[in-house]
From Swiss-Prot:
The BAR-like domain displays limited similarity to other BAR domains. May play a role in ciliogenesis. In cooperation with CBY1 may facilitate ciliogenesis likely by the recruitment and fusion of endosomal vesicles at distal appendages during early stages of ciliogenesis. PANTHER family: CBY1-INTERACTING BAR DOMAIN-CONTAINING PROTEIN 2, CBY1-INTERACTING BAR DOMAIN-CONTAINING PROTEIN HOMOLOG. It comes from Bos taurus. InterPro entries: AH/BAR_dom_sf (IPR027267), BAR_CBAR1/2 (IPR035590), CBAR/FAM92 (IPR009602). One of its GO terms (biological process) is cilium assembly. The gene is CIBAR2. SUPFAM superfamilies: BAR/IMD domain-like (SSF103657). GO terms for cellular component: centriole; ciliary basal body; ciliary transition zone; cytoplasm. This is CBY1-interacting BAR domain-containing protein 2. Keywords: Cell projection, Cilium biogenesis/degradation, Cytoplasm, Cytoskeleton. It is found in: Cytoplasm, Cytoskeleton, Microtubule organizing center, Centrosome, Centriole; Cytoplasm, Cytoskeleton, Cilium basal body. The lineage of its organism: Eukaryota, Metazoa, Chordata, Craniata, Vertebrata.
């Protein structure tokens, strides 16, 4: 009976190990899957922001247009990295956790098998004890019962040893998997953030180098140029500006000419619309 009690204690430890693993791995899988989905949603929102930035840039003056397009390009590049992050999380973190359910199920089946063998051993022992109490003189029946007990005990011992090896292997693999899964998780996050910081630094420099004064000059020239379009050109007008003409208006006229030239060049450069790239298309290159 002491052996049986020892086996019962051993089985409880094994069952607790598997139960705790099942609960914890299930929660890890659920939480990390939610983490990955939210990362994917963040990527989608950033894609929308990129599109909105490009749409807005197309309505602005040349300096702001170029700045916002470059900024949007950097932001889109970060989303390519984020897409790679999502795919790697699914492959190296979520899928291994999902597969753990199969291992837990197999280990539980081994424990159930052992408990069935152990119960048979207990049943044979109880049968032997009853025979000894009721028919102590029936040596043949008692001998047969003792043989059955011995056979059940050997079977239980063998199954117990097999189960011990199974659970030991399960525990060892569980610890290694926890280490690897979360090491992969941290590595994936570090790679993404390192690349993102690099691109965001470029985006910051792009915004910092924006020339506000050029756009203001262009904008003011446009405002003054609106009225100039409605003025009839006088015949044989002296090209020399009249001294009586206000200095600010003269400067405005010169600025208008410069801005019109800039606009012509800018319109040629932007004749072909830059489509928003499919951000998902670059993810495969990032995984290489």
């Amino acid at each position: 009976m002491n052996i049986i009690l020892s086996r019962d204690s051993q089985v409880r430890v094994m069952e607790d190990t598997v139960t705790n693993a099942e609960k914890s791995f299930g929660q890890f899988c659920s939480l990390l899957a939610a983490y990955t989905r939210k990362t994917a949603r963040l990527r989608d929102k950033a894609d929308q922001l990129v599109k909105q930035l490009i749409d807005f840039a197309n309505t602005e003056n040349p300096e702001m247009r170029a700045t916002l397009r470059n900024f949007a390009e950097d932001l889109a590049k970060v989303q390519d990295y984020r897409q790679a992050e999502v795919e790697r999380l699914e492959t190296k973190v979520i899928n291994p956790l999902k597969l753990y359910g199969v291992q837990i199920k197999q280990t539980r089946a081994e424990i159930k098998k052992f408990k069935s063998v152990r119960n048979n051993e207990i049943k044979q022992l109880e049968k032997l004890e009853k025979l000894r109490q009721k028919s102590p003189s029936d040596r043949q029946t008692i001998s047969q019962a003792e043989t059955s007990v011995q056979r059940a005990s050997v079977d239980a011992s063998r199954t117990s040893h097999q189960l011990e090896e199974t659970v030991d292997t399960f525990q060892k693999q569980k610890l290694k998997d926890i280490q690897k899964i979360f090491s992969d998780f941290v590595t994936i996050e570090m790679v993404f953030h390192a690349k993102a910081v690099e691109v965001y630094s470029s985006a910051f420099q792009t915004l910092e180098s924006y020339d506000l004064e050029k756009d203001l000059e262009d904008f003011r020239a446009k405002m003054h140029g609106v009225y100039g379009r409605y003025d009839a050109r006088p015949p044989l007008m002296d090209t020399t500006l009249s001294p009586a003409l206000p200095w600010s208006l003269a400067q405005s006229a010169q600025s208008t000419i410069r801005s019109q030239r800039k606009e012509a060049v800018s319109e040629d450069d932007s004749a072909e619309e830059d489509p928003v790239e499919d951000l998902r298309g670059q993810a495969q290159r990032l995984n290489q």
